Amino acid sequence: MKRLVVIDGKSVFYRGYYAMPGLSMADGTPTGGVYGFVSLAIELIKKLEPDYVAVAWDKRGTNIRKRRELYPEYKAGRKPAPDDFYQQIPILHELLDAFGWPLYEIDDYEADDIMGAFARQAESRGIETCLITSDLDALQLISPMTKVYAMKNGLRNIEEFTAEYFEQKYGIRTEQFLDLKALKGDSSDNLPGVPGIGEKTAVKLLQEYETLDGVYEHLDEQKGALRTKLENGRESAYLTKQVAEIWTDAPIELDWDVADVNDCDFARVTEILQKLEFNSLIGRLPKTMQMAENEKKEEPKLNIPRIEKLPDMPMFEAENIIYIDSSEPDVIYISSNSESAWTAKIDEISQSMWQLLAQGIVIAADVKQLYHALDNHGVAVRFHEVWDVEQAAFLIDPLKRDRSLNALSGDFSDDNSAPYQLVRLHKIYREQKVYMSNNSQIARVAYEFDFPVIWALFQMEKRGMKLDDTLLKQMGDELAAEVSRLEQQMYSMAGYEFNASSPAQLSEVLFTKLQLPTAGIKKGKTGYSTGQKELDKLRGQHPIIELIERYRELTKLISTYIEALPKLMATDGRIHTTFNQDVTSTGRLSSTNPNLQNIPVRTELGRKIRQAFVPSDGKVFVGADYSQFELRLAAVLAGDEKLIEDFNSDVDIHAKTAAETYGISIDEVSKSQRRAAKVINFGVLYGMSPHGLAAATGMSFTEAKKFIDHYFEVRKPIRQYLDKILTQAREQGFVETYFGRRRPTPDVKSSNFMVRSSAERAAMNMPIQGTEADLMKLAMIRLEDKLSGLADAILQVHDSILVECKPEDVQKVSEIMKAEMEGVCPELPIKLKVDVGTGANWGEV
């Protein structure tokens, strides 16, 4: 049996819009609704495998005109969608046209009516229909030949309705659905039904009397309030039924030839998806789209390179692409042009040949991974110059999610064998070189920071950090005992045992058993929230709150670190984390498997966990940490000459800020005043509000607001700088670091307040954090060479670098680290300060 799929266009688009808030192209064009629609539609088309596809659309302004003649209050009170909702509709329509999915809209009829008309037309032809919608009105269209796929919430929760499933769920037949709606009404459409009658009562009435007419024919059998409601609501019930009924006789005909699923223009679809930066969706397109007849004839032929065995004495070019296929980890491919490539077993290539190859530029998708792959085969080589394709892609567009070779090259064929990947690498490299030649600042960041630091990152990953798992186990036993004590104390307070890790059970204990106040506490489907923000509001109300917070702190540390870290130990007894350059859009390094950067440093327990990380036998740790790094860089970027002078004169910046803000001398500054100044000095860089300052210092909101106002009077260049950054973000669509690393800022124009506010904070933060990241990478590059043979860098966390060395070399290593890190960038007008410490474990440093 052939199958027709009809999509309720605006309904599905609406769900996509709110499921993907803030999604946009690099130039700021919003695309969340389009992405959500296409993503869902693709998956459903793959699942349902239709022969025909059509889209029903609500014509703006005129689609409900006829129903409003019947009931002027129909759909009254609905808020208009944001501007960027309508801004995306032409984009979606263009894409639907490329898909070959005809769009139908008509005056005076809604999308439901169009769907109903098409379903009946299909039924008369013996064609099955699947209706895709989030509007449950469509359930009245269910028949042996028509199914409804209803989106419940988001994009993934879809309910398939057949006649059998409908009856099982509602307890009535599909032909009774319209009468159900007539009785209970529909608040979303502003249809009253019978006021006071809900779904349960309506279902019960229909189970007994079959129809709305049957209910009123037996009205004398009802008593009391129910009878009164039915009597008073008779007119509104029948009006609701009339308005809610889907008009399947809508004057519109489906063109079956146009709706044929094989009418897709795949080349145009690919072009549009690439323009929208939806590269990941291209590979997900159904085969029926990719192999449409008009595309089979024009399928492009790739110029696949000729693969030859690597000769004994190869003449390498100045630029060579190296590729290792994960399915053949012991085989390497080397290509200097797109026409040919050499291949060989890694173990068969001599060290002298590697050294010869290393003299030129080595291009790879992931250079760090290439180093690891070669190291696994005992190859010790450092390339003179590298080009990391994925890192270059990140520099060019840090918001781009898909940086696979398929996405970067625009080639989404299924063949990912080595020859095809080499073709893609050549194409991407050529395009990236052109981009870099036209964007000197981005090129500088690549050549001076991101590419050279890859060697240092590889070395740190290879070295790893030694873990004292015995100490960790001992700590785990102690914490487990404390957790048990906390549980017993909480059980005693509650009067019974419960699962303290269950939000639902905890909510029951706090708000039902202990009767804690619920004013201002968020409430969800499972009860009142027990999140940290809500617990903060309850602090002091009952001693169990402090126990819960301690319990959560301990159980998180146990599961995240104490139990997890030993499982991640390699056979050498060390933890080998992975350092990523292309995760945070500021350019900061991140750490995964495990994330060593997130181990708490300011808590006693966090420091204890750090004590389990120890140096290699016979060595000690030396750590160097930039002091007030971000604030110094803020002074530079803002051009705050006064603040720069204070830093260069080693003035206590926080005390000076407090003195100037409060209008007193430095000698008169109290500890609390200095603390407030310290909080705002750093917090202002992240857009701290009066509420945030009040929460961090204990000030009242009024005091905090006054303090911030005075602060910006003293630090006018900082205020002007932050304002300038936001203006640049809005007008130019990006912000950048001191050295030219860029971050696109499309969301600063979002109509969603939360999305826009978050984007503004990120925009203010990025130039400072990004400059910090650039300088840290430069310091790592310098130290990797300066400390060679003397100390090994093993970890980088935000503003600090950790190395291990012999005890007798500590002083020399410390001096080198301090000198190199403080002098990392002589062009800066400010003096950088580095504190150096040493210890027998990470916690001591």
Language model: regions and residue ranges:
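Noncatalytic, basic helical substrate-engagement surface that gates or grips nucleic-acid strands
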Residues: 1-132, 136-162, 236-239, 245-253, ...
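Conserved RNase H-like, two-metal-ion catalytic cores of nucleic-acid enzymes
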Residues: 4-5, 9, 15-54, 68, ...
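Non-catalytic nucleic-acid-binding/docking modules located in mid-to-C-terminal regions
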Residues: 51-54, 72, 99-102, 124, ...
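Charged catalytic and DNA/RNA-contacting regions of genome-maintenance
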Residues: 130-132, 138-174, 352-436, 443, ...
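Conserved "right-hand" nucleotidyltransferase catalytic core of DNA-directed polymerases
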Residues: 233-348, 361, 418-601, 614, ...
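Function-dense linear segments that define catalytic or interfacial modules
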Residues: 335-338, 393-415, 419, 581-665
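Conserved catalytic core of nucleic-acid polymerases
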Residues: 462, 576-577, 581-584, 659-789, ...
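C-terminal polymerase-core module
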Residues: 484-488, 492-545, 713-761, 765, ...
